[in-house]
C-alpha cells in the first residue's frame, strides 16, 4: 500500500469513526513516522475524502487541518491553495435546461461552510502571531488570498441576475461569510511584521499588482457587507498604492517612508492586559436603559462574548453585579419610580431569560448558584438589605424585595433549583415563587378569551420573570390579528398598551419597536374603506386605537420612520407624521378633500351631530390628514367673528368622543404651534386649548385615551406655552393649562437630561460639560480599583454623555475622553481607564442603534431603506482620529499610542461575529426540551419555563456562540488578538467538540491503530 493510500485509509477511518482532534494528533504522529508524505499530497487526500462523503458540513475536517498546521506538517499558504482547488466556490449556477446534464455528472460537494472555518482558523493563526514565520510564507498566503478573492468575485458575477440586478453575493449567507473572512484575513496579514515587509519591498511588485487588482474588485462589494472592513482595506490600498498597476517610482519612493513608518509605529504599540472593569458593564447597561430600551439579544450577546471570550461564568457574574449596581445607583440618585421599574424589570424579567437562552444555545453547563452567590456578595448591603435587616435600617428599603424576585425568576427559568434560594438569601424568602408562563399556552388563552390579553398586559408591569413569555404571546397575537384584519380584538389590545407606557418599556426589552409596529403600520397603510360594510363609527374607533398605539411608541421614544417599520414613501402613517400637524391651503385640496372638509364643518358646527353619511364618505385616513385644516378653518372663522366661541367649543367637543379622540394628537400639535407663532391676541386659541386639554366633562371610556393624547403632546405644548408666558407675563390663562400638562411631562423616554442636571454639568469648573464628563470618568476609575468590595457604585447617569454628544458633538466629547485616558495612562491606570473609555464609545446610542442592529439583522435594500444615523458617533470620531495617527505619532507619540489601543479594543468588542454556518442541532435541542421552528433554528424559550426571547434574535444566538472566540481575535485590527491565543484556542476547541457531539461522536477506548487500514 503506497503512502498516499495509507493516509487515505487513515483519514477516511478518522472521519467515519469521529476521532476527536487530540486523538487525531496522536495517531497522525505515528503514521507520519511510518509514512512521511508531502503536505500538498496530504491535503489533496483529505479534501478528496471530504468530496467523496458529500457531507455539507463536517466540523472534524477543519479541526484536522488545524492540527496539521499546529504540528508543522502543512503550511497555511498550502492549506489555502489546496482548499481553493477543491472548493465549490468554482461551481456555476445551473440553468433549468442543464438539469439532465447535471444529473449525469458526479454531484460535487458543497464546501463553503468548511472553507469559512478553515479560513477563520488561518485568520486566528495570523492574528495571534503564529503565522507567517517567513517572508516566503507571507508571500504564499498573500497569493492564496488573491486567488480566493478572485474566485469569490467571479462567483458573485456568475450568480447575479443581470436583468434585475439581484442575487450574487448577498443571496448566500455562506458566500458573505467567506467574502468577509477573506477580507479580515488580508487585513490581519497586512498588519504583521512579515506582511508589512512584503508590501514595502520592491522585490514583490508582481504580487502587489495582483493584490491591487483583487482589492479593486473586492472593495465595491465590501460596501454592502462591512463598512469598517471596507474602510480598513481602503486604507491599506492607499497606504501601499495597491491599485493593480506598477507604481510611479518617484511617487513610490516619496511615500515608502511614510507608509512604513506609520504602519511600523502602529505595529510597535503593545497592548496591555485586558481588564474588564466593574465600571465597564455598569456604563453599558446604564446606556441601554437610559432612554428607549436599546436591547437587542444578538448585539448584547456579541458584546458580552467579545468582552469575556468563553468565560461564561465571569460573564454571568459581572452582568448580574452590574445590573444590581445600576439599580443601586438609581436609588442613590433619586431617579423616578418609572426609571427604577425599568431597571428592576431588566434585572428580573430580562436577565434570567437571556441567560437561559444563552446557555441553552451554547450547551455550556455553569455553576449558576455559585455565579449568583459571588455577584450578590459584591452588592451594597445598604441598598439591597435582607428581610431581617430591613427592621434595623433607618433608610429606604424600596429594593429589599429585588434579590428574592431575581432568584425566583432564575428558578422559574431553571437556572437554579428552588431549594437554593434560601441558601443564596441566607434566610427563608417571604415571597412565594411565581407560576412560570409558556408562550404558546398564553396565545391559546388569548385566542379563547380576549380579556386575557388585558390581564397579561397589566402583568407586564410586575416583576415575576414572566414578561418574556407575555411579550412573545402578545406580539404574536397582534401580528396574527393584523394578518387576519381582526381589528376589533386588536383595538382592545392596543388600548391596553397605549394607557400603560411602562408596559411599552418592558416590550422593548424583548422586541424591537420595528418588530412590534411594522404590522400595525402596514395595516393602517392598507386599510381599505370599502372592506367594511357595517357602521362607520366602530371602524373609526378601531382605526384610531391602532393608530394611537403607533403614535404612543413614536412620541415616547422619538422613533424615526425606519424604527416604525415604514418602508414606503406613500405610507399614510409617514404622511401623518410628516404633514399631519400642518394645515393645508384650501386651494391645494382636491375636490374630494374639499367635500369632506365641508361635511365635517357642517357636522361639527351646524348640524346636530356627526352623521353616518359624514363618516362613511370620508375614510379614517382622509379624516386624520384633514384634522389640522379643519381646526385652522374653524379657528380662523371664530377669530374673524363668523363663528361663536361656544359653537366652536361645542363642535370640538365631538372630538373628545373615543372614536375621534386620537385625532387630537395632530390637532393639539398644530394648535400649540399656531399659538406660539401667532402675533395677534392668542385669547381664542388659548381658550380652545384649555377646553380640549381640561374638558369640563368627558366619558369614562374617553378619559384614558385623553390622558394618552396629553402624554404625547404635553412636552411640546409646555415649551410653547412657557415661551408665550415669557412674552405675555401678565396673562392668567396660561398657568391653568400648564398645571394640567405638568403630570404628563415625564412621559417621554429619550435619554434627554433634566434642566437642573444640565446646569450643574455646564457650570462645572474646570471645563464645563466636557470637564464634568472627565470628572465622572475619574470617579469611575477610582471606584473600579476595588472591584470586589461591597460598596455603593459611583454616581453615574448616561444622560451626561448623551447630552455631550447631542450638544457639543462626538468629536469634542471623544477628545475629552482621550485627554482623560492619556492622563490616566501617565498615572498608571492605563488598562483600567482604557476599559471605561472603550465602554463609553461602544455603549449603544439611540441615534445609531438601527444601523448597529443591521449588522446582526441584515436589511434587504430592495425591500426597505437602509437605516441612517443623523449624528457622528463616538466610534465614528475615533475612526477619524485613528486615521490621523501617522501625523500625530510624530508630535505626540503617547496620545497616538492611546488612540491606537483605544481603536483596537473598540473594534475587538464591536466587531460582529462572522457568519458561521448553523449546525443542525435539532436532535440536541429536542433532548433539552427546547422548541425548534420549522426552519430549524432555535426558539430560545425553554419549555419548562416558557419565557420568550426575541424570535429574530434567537436565530443568531447559536451561530454567534459557535464562533465567538474566533471573532474576538479576528477583528478589523491585526493587533487586537495578541496575547489572547491560548484562551481563544480553548474556546474554539470546546465549541467544535460540542459541535462534533451533535453529529454523534461515540466513545473510543483502546483504539487499535492497525484496525484502521
Swiss-Prot record:
Key words of the record: Activator, Nucleus, Transcription, Transcription regulation
Gene Ontology molecular function terms on file: transcription coregulator activity
Record GO biological process: regulation of transcription by RNA polymerase II
InterPro entries on file: Mediator_Med5_fun (IPR014801)
Places the protein is found: Nucleus
Domain of life where this protein originates: Eukaryota
Residue spans crossing the bilayer: none
Statement: the UniProt record of this protein carries the keyword Manganese: no
GO cellular component: mediator complex
Function: Component of the Mediator complex, a coactivator involved in the regulated transcription of nearly all RNA polymerase II-dependent genes. Mediator functions as a bridge to convey information from gene-specific regulatory proteins to the basal RNA polymerase II transcription machinery. Mediator is recruited to promoters by direct interactions with regulatory proteins and serves as a scaffold for the assembly of a functional preinitiation complex with RNA polymerase II and the general transcription factors.
Similarity-based family: Belongs to the Mediator complex subunit 5 family.
Subunit architecture: Component of the Mediator complex.
Protein's recorded name: Mediator of RNA polymerase II transcription subunit 5
Annotated source species: Aspergillus oryzae (strain ATCC 42149 / RIB 40)
Amino acid at each position: 500500500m503506497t503512502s498516499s493510500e495509507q493516509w487515505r485509509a487513515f483519514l477516511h477511518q478518522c472521519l467515519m469513526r469521529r476521532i476527536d482532534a487530540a486523538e487525531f494528533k496522536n495517531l497522525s504522529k505515528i503514521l507520519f513516522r511510518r509514512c512521511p508524505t508531502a503536505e500538498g499530497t496530504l491535503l489533496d487526500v483529505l479534501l478528496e475524502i471530504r468530496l467523496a462523503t458529500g457531507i455539507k458540513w463536517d466540523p472534524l475536517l477543519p479541526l484536522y487541518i488545524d492540527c496539521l498546521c499546529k504540528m508543522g506538517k502543512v503550511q497555511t499558504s498550502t492549506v489555502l491553495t489546496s482548499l481553493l482547488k477543491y472548493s465549490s466556490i468554482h461551481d456555476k449556477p445551473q440553468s433549468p435546461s442543464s438539469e439532465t446534464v447535471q444529473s449525469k455528472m458526479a454531484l460535487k460537494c458543497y464546501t463553503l461552510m468548511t472553507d469559512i472555518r478553515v479560513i477563520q482558523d488561518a485568520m486566528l493563526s495570523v492574528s495571534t502571531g503564529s503565522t507567517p514565520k517567513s517572508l516566503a510564507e507571507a508571500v504564499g498566503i498573500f497569493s492564496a488570498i488573491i486567488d480566493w478573492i478572485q474566485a469569490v468575485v467571479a462567483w458573485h458575477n456568475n450568480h447575479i441576475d443581470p436583468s434585475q440586478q439581484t442575487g450574487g453575493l448577498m443571496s448566500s449567507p455562506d458566500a458573505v461569510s467567506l467574502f468577509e473572512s477573506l477580507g479580515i484575513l488580508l487585513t490581519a496579514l497586512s498588519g504583521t511584521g512579515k506582511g508589512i515587509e512584503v508590501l514595502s519591498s520592491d522585490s514583490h511588485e508582481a504580487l502587489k499588482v495582483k493584490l491591487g487588482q483583487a482589492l479593486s474588485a473586492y472593495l465595491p462589494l465590501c460596501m454592502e457587507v462591512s463598512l469598517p472592513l471596507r474602510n480598513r482595506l481602503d486604507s491599506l490600498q492607499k497606504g501601499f498604492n495597491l491599485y493593480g498597476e506598477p507604481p510611479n517610482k518617484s511617487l513610490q519612493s516619496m511615500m515608502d517612508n511614510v507608509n512604513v513608518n506609520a504602519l511600523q509605529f502602529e505595529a510597535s504599540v503593545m497592548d496591555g492586559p485586558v481588564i474588564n472593569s466593574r465600571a465597564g458593564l455598569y456604563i453599558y447597561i446604564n446606556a441601554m436603559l437610559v432612554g428607549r430600551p436599546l436591547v437587542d439579544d444578538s448585539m448584547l450577546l456579541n458584546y458580552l462574548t467579545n468582552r469575556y471570550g468563553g468565560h461564561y461564568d465571569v460573564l454571568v457574574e459581572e452582568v448580574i453585579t452590574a445590573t444590581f449596581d445600576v439599580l443601586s445607583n438609581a436609588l442613590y440618585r433619586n431617579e423616578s419610580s418609572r426609571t427604577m421599574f425599568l431597571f428592576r424589570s431588566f434585572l428580573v424579567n430580562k436577565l434570567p431569560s437571556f441567560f437561559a437562552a444563552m446557555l441553552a444555545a451554547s450547551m455550556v453547563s455553569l455553576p449558576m448558584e455559585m455565579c449568583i452567590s459571588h455577584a450578590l456578595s459584591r452588592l451594597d448591603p445598604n441598598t439591597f438589605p435582607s428581610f431581617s435587616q430591613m427592621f434595623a435600617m433607618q433608610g429606604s428599603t424600596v429594593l429589599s424585595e429585588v434579590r428574592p424576585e431575581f432568584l425566583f425568576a432564575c428558578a422559574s427559568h431553571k437556572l437554579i433549583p428552588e431549594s437554593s434560594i434560601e441558601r443564596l438569601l441566607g434566610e427563608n424568602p417571604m415571597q412565594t415563587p411565581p407560576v412560570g408562563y409558556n408562550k404558546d399556552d398564553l396565545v391559546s388563552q388569548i385566542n379563547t378569551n380576549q380579556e386575557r390579553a388585558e390581564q397579561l398586559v397589566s402583568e407586564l408591569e410586575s416583576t415575576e420573570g414572566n414578561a418574556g413569555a407575555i411579550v412573545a404571546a402578545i406580539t404574536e397575537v397582534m401580528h396574527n390579528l393584523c394578518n387576519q384584519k381582526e381589528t376589533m380584538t386588536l383595538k382592545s389590545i392596543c388600548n391596553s398598551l397605549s394607557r400603560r407606557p411602562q408596559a411599552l418599556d418592558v416590550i422593548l426589552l424583548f422586541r424591537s419597536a420595528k418588530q412590534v409596529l411594522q404590522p400595525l403600520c402596514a395595516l393602517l397603510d392598507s386599510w381599505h374603506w370599502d372592506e367594511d360594510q357595517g357602521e362607520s363609527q366602530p371602524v373609526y374607533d378601531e382605526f384610531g386605537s391602532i393608530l394611537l398605539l403607533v403614535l404612543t411608541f413614536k412620541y415616547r421614544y422619538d422613533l424615526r420612520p425606519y424604527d416604525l417599520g415604514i418602508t414606503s414613501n406613500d405610507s399614510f402613517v409617514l404622511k401623518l407624521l410628516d404633514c399631519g400637524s400642518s394645515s393645508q391651503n384650501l386651494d391645494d385640496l382636491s375636490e374630494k378633500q374639499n367635500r369632506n372638509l365641508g361635511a365635517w364643518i357642517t357636522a361639527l358646527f351646524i348640524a346636530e351631530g356627526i352623521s353616518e353619511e359624514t363618516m362613511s364618505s370620508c375614510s379614517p385616513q382622509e379624516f386624520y390628514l384633514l384634522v389640522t385644516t379643519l381646526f385652522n378653518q374653524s379657528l380662523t372663522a371664530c377669530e374673524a367673528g363668523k363663528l361663536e366661541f361656544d359653537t366652536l367649543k361645542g363642535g370640538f367637543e365631538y372630538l373628545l368622543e373615543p372614536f375621534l379622540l386620537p385625532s387630537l394628537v395632530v390637532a393639539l400639535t398644530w394648535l400649540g404651534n399656531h399659538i406660539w407663532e401667532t402675533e395677534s391676541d392668542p385669547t381664542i386659541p388659548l381658550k380652545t386649548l384649555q377646553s380640549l386639554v381640561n374638558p369640563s366633562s368627558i366619558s369614562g371610556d374617553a378619559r384614558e385615551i385623553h390622558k394618552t393624547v396629553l402624554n404625547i403632546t404635553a412636552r411640546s405644548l409646555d415649551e410653547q406655552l412657557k415661551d408665550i408666558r415669557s412674552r405675555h407675563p401678565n396673562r392668567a390663562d396660561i398657568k391653568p393649562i400648564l398645571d394640567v400638562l405638568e403630570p404628563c411631562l415625564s412621559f417621554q423616554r429619550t435619554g434627554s437630561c433634566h434642566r437642573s442636571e444640565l446646569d450643574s454639568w455646564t457650570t462645572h469648573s474646570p471645563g464645563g460639560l466636557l470637564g464634568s464628563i472627565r470628572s465622572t470618568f475619574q470617579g469611575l476609575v477610582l471606584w473600579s480599583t476595588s472591584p470586589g468590595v461591597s460598596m455603593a457604585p459611583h454616581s453615574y447617569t448616561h444622560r451626561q454623555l448623551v447630552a455631550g454628544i447631542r450638544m457639543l458633538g462626538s468629536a469634542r466629547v471623544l477628545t475629552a475622553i482621550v485627554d482623560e485616558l492619556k492622563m490616566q495612562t501617565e498615572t498608571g491606570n492605563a488598562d483600567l481607564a482604557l476599559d471605561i473609555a472603550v465602554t463609553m464609545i461602544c455603549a449603544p446610542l439611540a441615534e445609531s442603534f438601527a444601523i448597529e442592529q443591521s449588522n446582526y439583522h441584515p436589511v434587504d435594500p430592495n425591500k426597505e431603506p437602509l437605516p441612517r444615523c443623523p449624528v457622528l458617533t463616538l466610534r465614528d470620531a475615533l475612526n477619524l482620529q485613528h486615521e490621523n495617527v501617522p501625523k500625530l505619532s510624530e508630535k505626540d507619540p503617547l496620545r497616538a499610542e492611546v488612540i491606537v489601543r483605544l481603536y483596537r479594543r473598540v473594534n475587538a468588542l464591536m466587531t460582529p461575529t462572522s457568519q458561521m454556518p448553523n449546525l443542525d442541532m435539532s436532535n440536541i435541542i429536542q433532548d433539552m426540551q427546547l422548541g425548534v421552528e420549522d426552519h430549524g433554528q432555535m426558539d430560545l424559550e425553554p419549555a419548562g419555563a416558557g419565557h420568550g426571547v426575541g424570535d429574530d434574535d434567537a436565530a443568531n444566538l447559536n451561530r454567534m456562540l459557535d464562533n465567538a472566540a474566533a471573532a474576538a481575535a479576528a477583528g478589523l485590527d491585526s493587533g487586537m488578538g495578541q496575547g489572547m491565543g491560548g484562551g481563544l484556542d480553548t474556546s474554539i476547541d470546546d465549541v467544535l467538540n460540542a459541535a462534533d457531539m451533535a453529529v454523534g461522536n461515540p466513545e473510543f477506548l483502546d483504539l487499535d491503530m492497525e484496525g484502521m487500514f
